[in-house]
């Protein structure tokens, strides 16, 4: 509950660099917030995937392993995150500002009625004072990104809704292993409990009509 989550992009059976960069940043954010870092891997043939992930300081790795989850398609992966997040109630979710992240992020944030900031170049933790409402919010995610054609840098906060979601550009954050022997929990989920059959794309084959 209220942890930092990172969605892992899987290229075959390899975790994408942008996701490993986000694990590094996610670990730092979790330390600041005094919470755990969790990651979500959805794909096929993911046995041993934890060896790539846990050394970055991941406390819990959620694994969804099924043939219908690779290659990536929108609906199954959206259902994985939406239904998992309803259970786990994360305070932050990070994913790469990639073709997949730009498709998946808005779907998940819309379903959960949470905010999403795209193409962030920096993430920090800080407070926000809403003078109009007379409220001060602590430990918010500062989602920092270029705006107005890159002429200014905007800092965006989401005080009311969770999770605070952001996509982050590849290569703007360092990828650093925390501890090669880091011990985290691996949770293997039953995909059928999260993804309805109707989400999967079915490829239908038809035989040509016989010639007269």
What are these regions (language model features)?
Residues 1-207, 211:
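N-terminal glycine-rich FAD/FM-binding segment characteristic of electron-transfer flavoproteins
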